[in-house]
Amino acid sequence: VMPRWAALRWSESQPWAALGICGATPQKRPTPAAALLKGLLIAAGLLTVIASVVLLEGSGDWRGEVDATQLTNAVLLCLGVGFAEELIFRGWLWAELNQMLGSRRGAVAQASIFSLVHTRFNLGLGAMSGLLVGLFLLGMVLARQRQSDRGSLWSCIGLHGGLVAGWFLLQSGLLELSTNAPAWLVGPGGSAPNPLGGAVGLISLLILLLIQRTAVAKAARPATGARNAS
């Protein structure tokens, strides 16, 4: 559906390239495998920071237990959620918003929508606010990642999917959170916390976003935005 939409709505002769899945100018984009691996490594780095602070603070214990079923589920989560959601949010939605609002406002708008769609509104105001901000920052990080990869979506897929799959593995047996672990640290959500809404997650995402902005500025790309990057 989306490739056909890109071909008709955007008058693209290479709709998959416009969506960031394959490259119209492959010499300027990282290979899908390299970009996917880069995204996975960034996700692993973020989760390592969060888990390390949790362990050092005494709010969890390292168990290191994981089985084949959990690994299989993690891989499916990584590729399924990462591919589907990035194709929708950073592939299609961002391009549509760019056409209506321009590159900068389009990036903010897609991150805002991404945050609202994923936030749990049954939480208290403070917890919900932290989660909204964390998810917004993640949406901006993913947009910057696509920009830095010259329109390729594969690093975004690896980063997004890696965070989902990695946190699933941590909660499934690698890391046991204490029942009294503070929400400001592990994130809101009670027994199923989202670390992106906690202090460590927020600070880590903000630092990553600043690093990405510097990298994009240094690259001095001639055009910005999801469509132009494609």
Regions found by a protein language model. Give the residues of each.
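Hydrophobic core of alpha-helical transmembrane segments in multi-pass integral membrane proteins
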Residues: 1-6, 43-55, 196-216
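Juxtamembrane helix-loop-helix connectors linking adjacent transmembrane helices
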Residues: 12-88, 94-100, 184-185
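Hydrophobic alpha-helical transmembrane segments
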Residues: 36-41, 71-75, 104-109, 129-133, ...
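Small-polar-interrupted transmembrane alpha-helices in polytopic inner-membrane proteins
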Residues: 47-50, 78, 82, 102-119, ...
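Aromatic-anchored segments of alpha-helical transmembrane domains
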Residues: 47-53, 111-121, 161-173
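Membrane-interface helix/loop boundary segments of multi-pass membrane proteins
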Residues: 84-109, 144-152
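Functionally important transmembrane alpha-helices
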Residues: 128-187
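C-terminal membrane module of polytopic membrane proteins
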Residues: 161-230
